[in-house]
Amino acid sequence: SFYLYKQVEQTAVFHNRDFLRCQMTAISTAAFLDSYFARIGYQGPVEPSLEVLQQLHVLHPQAIPFENIAPYRGDSVPLDLAAIVDKLIHRRRGGYCFEHNTLFLAVLQQMGFNVTPLIARVRWQVPAEVETGLTHMLLRVEIEGRSWFADVAFGSTTQTAPLEFVLDTPQTTPHGIYRITQTREVLSLQFQTRSGWQTVYQYGLAPASQIDFEIGNWYTSTYPQSVFLNSLLISRTQPGIRELMVNDTYTQRDNAGLSQRHQYKDAPAWAECLQTRLGLTLSREEAQELFLCVSQSQDAASELTGG
């Protein structure tokens, strides 16, 4: 497994430089980092250390919600960094994996971290016989000769800590236990549930290119059967709990797996929950429009859906 890792390491170095140059062309580094730190409430040192990565990784999904409002409404999801910064930071909205992890990648690289973007096949709650495409973005981060996987956006199963690249070893995070397994050249991220280990996604170590994410994003946001076009999914982590809105139903789950649920019957109360519990503020008109859509939806997604 580590032989494969070394094979792609040199390629990743050159790739990262190209990716960063494309993404940061028109954005001031200092202003970018300052605005991001203010958005997530980070006040620590600006250095490429494990401790800093861990702090950012827990703060990001607490402050910036995972949400798919744009594709659910039929809008495009641009992946250029300027658009993502405007949406997730300045307009204080959320997004899904390609948006969150593109932002996180740019932040880490500007802080001096050695980061490689990767792409994965989602397997969460997908039958083993069903094939899936490359529709999820994650990051590999090198710190002092050790490799870590960072991922701040997988819906209700989002990591709140980087995971070290060690195989078959349970790793405890603030929101659950994960492990990384390997079959041939394929790595699998698994999450421990009450019914056992469940595979979240599968991936390799070859660095992904921007075009890979553009293709995955286009498919995810336009394919008629995509969950992101058929159900509204909004989630956020808070200390000790995960919070999720699927259409009109809010679920709060603690680390023991205990949950409480409430289905909303009117737009004002629903919008207030989004604002106070999930950190997402909508205008009255937008809330009414979205609530009408979700309350009429016939395709209720599982409370555990991620993406």
Kindly give the residue locations of the regions a language model identified.
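Aromatic (phenylalanine/tyrosine) cluster motif
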Residues: 2-5, 14, 19
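Mixed-charge, low-complexity segments
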Residues: 24-94, 109-133, 154-307
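Short beta-strand scaffold segments in enzyme catalytic cores
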Residues: 137-140
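Beta-strand scaffold of nucleotide-dependent catalytic cores
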Residues: 150-152
